[in-house]
Regions:
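Membrane-interface helix-loop-helix junctions at transmembrane boundaries of multi-pass membrane enzymes
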Residues: 136-139, 252-257, 311-313, 352-364, ...
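Hydrophobic, aromatic-rich transmembrane alpha-helices
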Residues: 245, 345-352, 435-459, 506-517
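Membrane-helix boundary/interfacial segments in multi-pass membrane proteins
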Residues: 33-43, 91-99, 164-165, 272-292, ...
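Extracytoplasmic
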Residues: 546-716
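Hydrophobic/aromatic-rich transmembrane helices and adjacent perimembrane loops
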Residues: 44, 231-234, 289-296, 335, ...
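Membrane-embedded, hydrophobic transmembrane alpha-helices
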Residues: 1-137, 477-484, 491, 505
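Active-site lumenal/periplasmic loops and adjacent helix-entry segments of GT-C-fold
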Residues: 142, 146-296, 307, 332, ...
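Transmembrane alpha-helical segments
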Residues: 155, 268, 329, 333, ...
Length: 716
């Protein structure tokens, strides 16, 4: 008892002391530690994690102890701080208001930790009873070595990966930069400077959390996200999967074994393109929708399984809070959780049809989900006169014209997101189930789970998730109904996110049980018995060796992209982008090509652009117009940008500049357009540090006449 009490006090004392030290670092020693940004990042993350880790320690210790404490604490903190941001966003208050509220929450948590350390008080989740965690007889042991090695490899790849030069991440970072620029949160659209109406941005707490991270740590937003948060999120995602496996399989070794297979899956599928499993994993975790896929979905399933099996209402409370919080991150996360839980609930009730306890627990979770979606579903139509799904689609952070958003997925076959039939119905593209690893794991996992589904909560969760999600996205009438009435067609492929999660976990479980069967039959032979105990680790090592050629092939384009991005000034970025951040102090319009302009608002909250990745629409515009005749709004800014930089007459160019009230034009140095602008009046080169690009200050009153006609004394 004394040892347990001492251990409890030491943990809370460590949290309180580390939190206090972190407060000192970020508040008092920031300038002194500016040369060591990693230290400031660690301090900021310590403050961020403190509330969630303490709550998980105090109330969830039966299932989430040891390494599982970290991802549980992360999801609780991330969800809590996201919900905290919602009223601030709706009120369009400043980031400082949010920071004060978050700071109070952290300070209260640290004070509670200090009091618990001094008094030795126990909480419900720490009661000295034989809980599920005590039933975990198989500790990780040597299995931690390959797991941590694979986690380290993926984190390293995430660290060295250069972001997509044209990806969604730059849109998100533009919003975050706007929050850092002052003023009301979600009050101004970051690309064009317009007002923000009823939009998903008004409830997106994930972006506010990233703004708070940048402000508290003092690290530049872009560098902080790509150099620190991205590899950190990779580690958390793998630990989250481990935590889910640990809850379901009740074995630390089995969970680590499954975690190794999960990590190897991403390593085998590495690639620079973000449309591969591995490329997505190492590049896109800072995006809100990917956070729901890799953090909130598996942790919600873990909380649900713990509640269904043990019946303790604190796990139900965590499940309900995660479901509520995920809406403040990205609504698609709520849809994937709901779909998974529907399958789980149906199978659990089918396996226990006469159990009042089973009915009560499943109905409680279902009611929680219905209440979470019912409130906005009732209020939004009353306020706007439109269904909730239409409002979210019309104002998606990444979208412009909602009709374009609805049809883009059908005209981008290279992304393998959807498969359309001749009658107009559609399903998710079969590429997911045609992946060799997923296909084998799915076909072997289904009969394995069916054999156990009657008596195992884990089998019920995994099989229910796999089966119902497959029906939802691969049965044409069902998928078409969901795409037309519940989510957009372009969201159908995201509804399938639970399939690889559950399939890989089921396959890992199958291999683990196979290994146990082999071990049991070899236990009578001394030498073979010793080898059999190391069998899981040996299997992982063998699979890693076999995967090495695929990993090497996947790393090659990642390295090539990093070097090409460095050479082109995409990442690390050309010095002109930090110049925008440091020198532009009032609202400004910059005319730049789509490729160059995509990053400008991510560096400057005052710099707006003429087009927001408009070439993506223009490239498929004829096909989109064919699908929705008369309903597509042609993005004028995108048309003007393409025409200006493709070569146009002086008159047309002047019209474009005046139409958008352009203040600066950004062109490639020594290009024909650079020479042309230099020969015209009204364009004055700006002194900036870039050698790749030239920035011209535009005088709209004088543009269009030859420079030779200017008086030498004419001011610009």
């Amino acid at each position: 008892m004394g040892k347990t009490l001492s251990r409890l006090r030491l943990f809370e004392a460590a949290v309180a002391l580390s939190g206090g030290a972190a407060f000192v670092m970020v508040l008092l020693l920031r300038e002194a530690l500016a040369a060591f940004p990693g230290v400031l990042v660690i301090g900021t993350l310590a403050l961020f994690l403190a509330p969630g880790v303490l709550l998980a320690r105090w109330f969830l210790d039966e299932h989430f102890s040891g390494a599982a404490l970290a991802p549980a604490g992360f999801v609780i903190s991330a969800g809590g701080f996201a919900l905290l941001a919602v009223p601030v966003l709706i009120a369009q208050a400043s980031l400082e208001v949010y920071l004060w509220a978050a700071g109070v929450a952290v300070a209260v948590s640290l004070l509670a930790a200090a009091l618990a350390a001094l008094t030795g008080r126990r909480f419900a989740g720490q009661a000295a009873e034989k809980g599920v965690e005590r039933d975990v007889a198989e500790r990780g042991g040597v299995m931690w070595v390959p797991f941590l090695a694979l986690v380290g490899v993926l984190a390293y790849v995430a660290k060295i990966t250069a972001p997509s030069s044209y990806g969604d991440i730059w849109v998100y970072l533009a919003w975050v930069r706007g929050y850092l620029g002052g003023g009301g949160l979600a009050s101004v659209e970051p690309f064009f400077g317009g007002e923000v109406g009823l939009s998903r941005a008004r409830i997106n707490g994930w972006l506010v959390e990233q703004a708070a991270f940048a402000r508290v740590s003092g690290v530049d937003l872009v560098d902080g996200v790509f150099s620190y948060l991205n590899p950190f999120f990779v580690v958390v995602a793998l630990l989250t999967f481990y935590s889910l496996a640990r809850v379901l399989l009740k074995s630390e070794r089995a969970a680590l074994f499954c975690g190794c297979l999960y990590a190897l899956f991403f390593l085998v599928h590495l690639g620079q393109t973000r449309f591969t499993f591995g490329g997505e994993f190492v590049q896109r975790l800072p995006e809100d929708k990917l956070a729901t896929k890799f953090f909130f979905l598996p942790m919600a399933l873990a909380f649900a399984a713990a509640f269904i099996e043990g019946g303790k209402w604190r796990y139900f409370s965590c499940f309900a809070c995660v479901c509520c919080a995920v809406v403040a991150v990205h609504p698609i996360g709520f849809a994937t959780i709901g779909l998974s839980m529907a399958g789980f609930g149906i199978l659990h009730l089918a396996s226990n049809p006469r159990s009042r306890t089973a009915w009560a627990r499943v109905l409680a979770m279902g009611l929680a989900g219905l209440l979470i979606v019912a409130v906005p579903a009732a209020l939004v139509p009353a306020i706007t006169g439109q269904p909730l799904t239409d409002v979210l689609a019309d104002s998606d952070i990444n979208s412009g014209d909602p009709d374009v958003l609805r049809n883009m997925v059908f005209v981008s076959p290279e992304r393998a997101r959807i498969f359309e039939f001749a009658d107009g119905s559609y399903i998710m593209h079969p590429s997911l189930l045609l992946d060799p690893i997923i296909a084998v794991a799915y076909m072997l996992g289904i009969p394995f789970l069916l054999w156990r589904v009657q008596r195992s909560v884990a089998a019920q969760l995994l099989f229910g998730t796999m089966f119902l999600t497959t029906v939802a996205v691969y049965v044409p009438p069902v998928a078409t109904f969901l795409g037309d009435n519940v989510v957009l067609p372009g969201q159908i492929w995201r509804l399938a996110w639970p399939i690889p999660l559950a399939t890989l976990l089921a396959f890992g479980w199958l291999l683990w049980e196979t290994g146990r069967w082999v071990t049991a039959h070899l236990s009578g032979v001394r030498l073979l018995s010793v080898l059999s105990r190391a069998l899981p680790s040996l299997v992982v090592v063998v699979l890693a060796v076999l995967a090495a050629p695929w990993v090497s092939d996947g790393l090659e384009p990642i390295r090539e992209h990093r070097e090409s991005s460095r050479a082109a000034g995409f990442y690390p970025v050309d010095p002109i982008y930090p110049w925008f951040r440091d020198e532009i102090e009032s609202p400004t319009v910059v005319l730049a090509s789509d490729l160059l302009g995509a990053r400008i608002p991510a560096y400057s909250s005052e710099a707006n652009v003429v087009s927001r990745r408009g070439s993506l629409v223009l490239n498929v515009l004829p096909r989109v117009q064919e699908r929705a005749p008369g309903r597509i709004e042609i993005p004028q800014g995108a048309v003007d940008v393409r025409e200006f930089f493709a070569g146009t007459s002086i008159r047309t160019g002047v019209e474009i500049l005046r139409r958008h009230e352009v203040d600066y034009v950004m062109v490639t140095a020594n290009s024909p357009l650079d020479a042309a602008l230099d020969s015209l009046s009204g364009f004055k080169p700006v002194e900036e540090p870039s050698e790749r690009y030239v920035l011209y200050r535009v005088n709209l009153q004088k543009i269009g006449t030859p420079a030779s006609a200017k008086s030498p004394n004419t001011p610009e």
